[in-house]
Amino acid sequence: MPIRNSKDLPSIIVLVLLCLLANGSHADEDLAYLDLSLEQLLHVPVTGSTLTEETLKTVPAAVSIFTREQIDRLGMDYLYELLNLVPGFQFNRNASNGLAYTYSARGRRTTQQSLEVMLLIDGKVVNDPRAGSPDITLPLYPLARIERLEVIRGPGSALYGSSAFTGVINIITRKQQKSLALAYGSQQRRQLEGFWSQSVGGWESDFFIHAYKDNGEQFTLRDSFSGQPITTSDPRQQLAVDLALKQGDTGISLSYNRAETEDFYQSENTANGFNANERELWHIAFDQSFKWLPDTQSQVVLSYQQFYYDFKLYVTAPGFLANYSNPPSAEPFWGDAGLAGESWRFTFSNDWAIDDQSSAQWGVQWAQHEETRASARGNYDFIQLSHGQFPVAFYGDEGKVFPIGTEASQSNVGFFVQYLRDLRESTRLTLGGRYDDFTELAGRFSPRLGLVEQLNQTYSLKLLYGEAFRAPTLAEIGLINNPLLFGNPDLNHEIVKTWDLILMGNWKATNLSVGVFENRYEHPIETVFVGAARTYRNGPEEKSQGVEVEWAQELSTHWSLRSTYTYMDLPASAFREAARTGSFEINYAAEKWNWNLLGFYQDERQTPITPTSEQTLDDFWMLNTQWRYQFSAGYELKLQVKNITNEEATTPAQSLGKLDGIPNRGRELSAEVEWRF
């Protein structure tokens, strides 16, 4: 396994110390962390599933909710970490780059990106315009920005169209906050987070900033070309700035995100001192609510998104092309690539209150995606190498620029309608669908049906059916002249048809949800090997099924417990996914402080060694803890330990030959002081 070169800190002592601190207090009043009881949690609004306010008991979907109070107590910093506490979700760190933390829902992830999950922030889509994934545009989304998180498992195309394939993540951001937080920790972690809100001239403004930098952790990896051990690191830095303005029914939002990393892996290859990448996302949105029909609330949203991704890598080792280049050169084949895309979205939606028992939602959405740049400068000929044309021309240090994408565009129009009705006091019906029309691809209709029955005061039953599709992205279709990965212009939609049956039990101190699901995939888009390179294709029909359990328990006035478990029967193509996952969270809250211990588990997975064989990676538990103390005058201290036991957890690669998988970071310690004013 990869060796992690970090000092063996006394994690057990740290954990025991925190436990002793917890047991030493006998305060009678609860801190705000437990202000929201399990019974109250059942009535937290859920809006991402139907575009109307539902609750956990009535929403026609498999949903997990995290409120601000719950997020505050977790020993986690980023969205991809928290998703490990959701049934059916799991994370994967791959070798695309040092920031490549991706996630999947219900065992479906065919590339190094989360193409099958849609990410919404305040109702706006932020998936990458050209590659279709949210984890590229926002690889490390800070939890500090989130007021409420809704994680929906299952198809969402009946409302959102393509990419809402196996899940939808709906983030509602924090508003009207004033705070400043400073943190320092392992790998010289330096972090600043701040909120500011102000009312000026009738406009309410909300500002957020997140700035982060660390020196990275040292790892011993196998060199991608020689196979010999090398020492590398994964330093990173990030800047996120959000500004939201609102006056009455009018809203404007502007977001900027930038992230950088170097060394480690880049596009599955090592190259210390050369590997580097940086990405930049701009997102601006305007929304206006109004009434133009009786009993109907309407909204228009116009958004624009621009994304840049620049990276440098070695394609071959020094000397590899010495006998196959003209003029002959022993220089490594390096590439300096730039990818960029932009998207426009316009949505017109309506919520019609028909009567006391029923409502209808309908609307239209137009989207235009364009790959505005896809080129790379290299010192050898990309085209000749990609097509096996030897000798390959050598251009020296100046290099030559080659296209690596078709710089095409893709547009679609979607029409959706949904009908909600209380058939009787205990039965709620959801019926809807959406038709999407594409310029270059066949149209697709995605239906949904949901029945929610309140069996009694304790139990409720949900029977759900939905279909979703995912259109091939501009990157999957148009990637060219790439010796590592190339596109397939003949790809078609992939389709999933899903059944869910969910039983919920709710008692005064206990919430329990047990669900079973079945997915049937038609024309699934797969990543396959052609020699050592990869490409995409529509594969044969596949099926998966599973069980998801979520349990929350208030043990006493101060103690609470939450746990999840997932078991899935997955197709052979999902060898990179864990068939079993689980998590637990133990929390103790008192008047001034809070202590939390959480852990998540991922079963064995496989990483590809040859086009026809895989290597099994060990399963692992990851444990985190956090202790918070609230001083007077709004000051708060947070001590956090991630990966308490320094577990050497590895996750699967996309390319061949990485016997040990991709290493994750070891133990990380940090201290943070926050001032709320």
Give each language-model segment a name.
Residues A244-E260, R279-L441, Q454, T510-V516, ...:
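Face-selective signature of the C-terminal outer-membrane beta-barrel domain
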Residues V14, S197-S199, P235, L239-V241, ...:
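Conserved C-terminal beta-signal and adjacent last beta-strands/turns
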Residues A158, N170, A183, F195-N277, ...:
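Periplasmic-side early beta-strands and strand-to-turn transitions of outer-membrane beta-barrels
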Residues A27-D72:
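Short, acidic, small-residue-rich periplasmic hinge/interaction motif at the N-terminus
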Residues D422-L429, V516-Y521, R537-I609, Q640:
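Gram-negative outer-membrane beta-barrel transporters
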Residues V125-R153:
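Short acidic/polar hinge/loop motifs at secondary-structure boundaries
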Residues G273-K291, L339, I404-Q410, S460, ...:
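Outer-membrane beta-barrel signature, preferentially recognizing the C-terminal barrel domain
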Residues P45-S64, Y80, N84-V125:
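Extracytoplasmic beta-strand/coil segments of soluble accessory domains associated
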